[in-house]
Design a protein with these regions (language model features):
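C-terminal regulatory/interaction regions
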Residues: 67, 71, 90-204
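His/Asp/Glu-rich metal-coordinating catalytic cores
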Residues: 1-110, 129-139, 162-164
Length: 204
């Protein structure tokens, strides 16, 4: 929100704590709206269950998934404690307005497979993440079947490769489709690149 940041700058700022994760990446980060459009195009072609896994802390991505669920006529269900926690916190802070209400997973499992979309934690293959439990068949409410689609709307954090590839191998063995940033445009970083940071410092 360029105008809002400029107004903050006009009031006078003594110090600012800023995200510098992608400071060494030249140029600008990709647009979340472009990812949203790409995800929608992908989901419109799917006829069975869709499960998207992403970082729970990426509220913009969460909003994009809710948007896609509504546009494709699907109900949405959140899976994983941190996903529920971030959703509630974001709503409390005034974000995620005008979205469809998520279903409890116990309700969601009764929905026709072409009418449900899950948003789950565990995109890095974490042993206790929701994705691992779903894929291993140990989740009490959520399951996947042959022909369903899993979208990894995230990047691999260095060091997590083995865990994640083991998880994805298990998904493939179950004849479930995998879509990730390796074969489709389903993720942009939530961290600003160098030129984005220059703009923000200039505005503030």
């Amino acid at each position: 929100d360029e105008e809002k940041l400029k107004k903050i700058g006009e009031t006078g700022v003594s110090a600012m704590i800023c995200d510098s994760t992608n400071i060494f990446n030249a140029g600008r980060a990709g647009s979340e709206s472009d990812v949203r459009d790409s995800l929608l195009q992908i989901m419109e072609l799917k006829t069975k269950r869709i499960l998207v896994t992403s970082f729970a802390s990426n509220v913009a991505r969460m909003e994009s998934i809710f948007y896609c669920a509504k546009k494709t006529g699907r109900s949405i269900s959140l899976v994983g404690r941190s996903m529920h926690r971030i959703f509630k916190a974001a709503k409390k802070c005034g974000y995620l307005k005008g979205l469809i209400e998520p279903l409890d997973p116990r309700e969601a499992k009764r929905i026709a497979k072409n009418k449900i979309l899950y948003l789950a934690t565990g995109s890095q293959g974490e042993p206790m993440g929701a994705m691992n439990r779903i894929v291993s068949g140990s989740h009490p409410e959520v399951f996947l079947e042959e022909g369903d689609c899993v979208i990894f709307s995230s990047k691999i954090i260095p060091g997590n490769e083995k865990k994640l590839y083991n998880l994805q191998n298990q998904i493939v063995r179950n004849n479930i489709e995998i879509i990730s940033e390796e074969n489709a445009f389903v993720h942009v970083s939530g961290h600003p690149n160098r030129d984005d940071l220059k703009d923000m410092y200039k505005w503030v």
